[in-house]
Amino acid sequence: MTAESGDQIPTVHVATSLPKRRVSSSVLIVPVVSTGDDEQSGERPGAVVASAEPFLSADAIAEIEAGLRALDATGASDQVHRLVVSSLPVSSVLTVGLGKPRYEWTPDAVRRAAGAAARALGTAKAVVTTLADLPGDGVCAAAVEGLILGSYRFSAFRSAKTAPKDAGLHKITVLTTTKDARKHCAHGAAVATAVATARDLVNTPPSHLYPAELARRAKVLGESVGLEVQVLDEKALQKAGYGGLVGVGQGSSRPPRLVRLTHRGSRLAKNPRRAKKVALVGKGVTFDTGGISIKPAASMHYMTSDMGGAAAVIATVALAAQLELPINVIATVPIAENMPSATAQRPGDVLTQYGGTTVEVLNTDAEGRLILADAIVRACEDNPDYLIETSTLTGAQTVALGARIPGVMGSDEFRDRVAAISQQVGENGWPMPLPDELKDDLKSTVADLANVSGQRFAGMLVAGVFLREFVADAVDWAHIDVAGPAYNTGSAWGYTPKGATGVPTRTMFAVLEDIAANG
């Protein structure tokens, strides 16, 4: 499962020993931990190899540790050093720090270390690593995820003048004695590839990824993994009454679309009648100028990421089909481009959402909630047990939680469940409240609701309260606001590159796995 414009995803292999012959352009990645950072002992900080036996000889380990001492390595988290060890059948050894020793390692500590190492590989074509043999549940899959995600790059639109001269990483060999290692590594590779698919979609510029094109790519990807696919064009949307989606898209020469992707996994369940049904909804604004309520020019180019929610949902439902989750998953993806023009909706317009609720559009830059409202009502018509939706909803999310922590809103119990799982997988969602009194701020003098409040504060929560009005009462619901986390405008870190991150693909898929296992 890959997007059409992405770079090559490396293949993953499992082995129990190093190759017997030297492999050119290859790197051995070895984790190291900190030692001697104790004020009472006065011992000088240093680094020692972790998880290398039985793959490396005592002499090779001693040579690596001698090199680390010469470099004053401390084994601090994400610290990398490159060494040449003549006795090993690789071009070089790359050590990556894990920090202080632990009896067990969390998957995200390993994932992040693997990502940091992958970003330091340079032109290496193949890597071998002992990271997957560290003690701890889930570290095998996490090591693979980190290596794939850390080596991710997007060069589809570079000419020969600036395109990478090398082919990139194409082979990962995991050294491990872990039981079921092949299964765990395959799972990690599939998850990482889905995240890369979401990244590719977000990184594709709006000149090349407009509503009809995103719908086409979703259809191609969906059909490749056996999903049922339905695409509604602008005429079908108008006829069916998708007023929010039509209203947001009417200012653009590129008309809106609605995509439905269905995975019927109940047939795979032990008891098909008891299999849960999950609805996914993701905001797909392929470019957001703000419309008539236009955004500042300085940072508008980042709005290529305003379809990050749609990208994550498309990748997630495709992954559910690929890995044959025994639950039903139905994704509803509203897609539009928000542009100012003579045909654009105006502040003060009233539109009728799918399902009949009328909304006064006080600010055309609060467009995501309008297309999501249509999609939520349509998704709830399928009577799902759970609804998970995600979007780059509000700039207020970054004010409240920063650029790396998604805000999770919704039904109290399910919201907390989603946030907890998000933290477990390293995407670090944080539960947020939806105070009932904020609904009063959405009163309109001419319609059922206004799309924004007149207050400066609690913008993320107000948007969540607006969306809650369209969720069926019987449905457990969570919204993941990834306005900041979906797109990294700063420097790369861990397994996260500059640009599209793929958040919250791993959260949503992990929630689906949890529902499949526990209901």
Swiss-Prot record:
Intracellular or extracellular location(s): Cytoplasm
Active site per database record: 295, 369
GO biological process entries: proteolysis
UniProt cofactor(s): Mn(2+)
Pfam families per UniProt: Peptidase_M17, Peptidase_M17_N
Domain of life the protein comes from: Bacteria
Annotated EC: 3.4.11.1, 3.4.11.10
UniProt binding sites for Mn(2+) 1: 288, 365, 367
Catalyzed reactions per annotation: Release of an N-terminal amino acid, Xaa-|-Yaa-, in which Xaa is preferably Leu, but may be other amino acids including Pro although not Arg or Lys, and Yaa may be Pro. Amino acid amides and methyl esters are also readily hydrolyzed, but rates on arylamides are exceedingly low; Release of an N-terminal amino acid, preferentially leucine, but not glutamic or aspartic acids
Keywords associated with the record: Aminopeptidase, Cytoplasm, Hydrolase, Manganese, Metal-binding, Protease
Signal peptide as annotated in the record: none
Gene Ontology annotations for the cellular component aspect, listed alphabetically: cytoplasm
Cofactor binding remark: Binds 2 manganese ions per subunit.
MF GO annotations: manganese ion binding; metalloaminopeptidase activity
Location (main, coarse): cytoplasm
Binding site for Mn(2+) 2: 283, 288, 306, 367
Family: Belongs to the peptidase M17 family.
Function, as annotated: Presumably involved in the processing and regular turnover of intracellular proteins. Catalyzes the removal of unsubstituted N-terminal amino acids from various peptides.
PANTHER family, A to Z: CYTOSOL AMINOPEPTIDASE (PTHR11963:SF23), LEUCINE AMINOPEPTIDASE-RELATED (PTHR11963)
Protein name: Probable cytosol aminopeptidase
Organism expressing this protein natively: Mycobacterium ulcerans (strain Agy99)
